[in-house]
Amino acid sequence: IGSLFRMADAFGIEKLILCGGDIALGRKTAKTARATEKIVNYDIRESATEVVESLKKQGYQIISLEITTTSKPIHNFKFLKNQPIALIIGDENFGISETILYSSNHIIHIDMYGQNSSMNVVQATNIALYEITKQIL
């Protein structure tokens, strides 16, 4: 989680919303975050589904980063500049729930060419935020 704070700061993310019932921001997080947890706007919420629905009502594009049978490669996806983006990233072990995938406006993935079928959530998020930033700035 600390790495997510550092990355959110690096890319100028408006807000980091962490969802789940067992999220602790302890010493390990603070050490990895290198004090960015003190400057990045964040919230901890129980229900990811409620957060996604609220963001949709506020006009955000809900874009989930997950490999599915219908996801589009991120390098072929065109991010809209005139609508705020909520990038949804999943749990390291379980990914993004089917409910949230169904609620998403778009599902994108990062093409992989090695033997492994997935990559670390933080590294995938870094790649996605780089691509989004490259396109919209």
Describe each PLM feature range.
Residues 1-137:
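Post-transcriptional modification and biogenesis factors for structured RNAs
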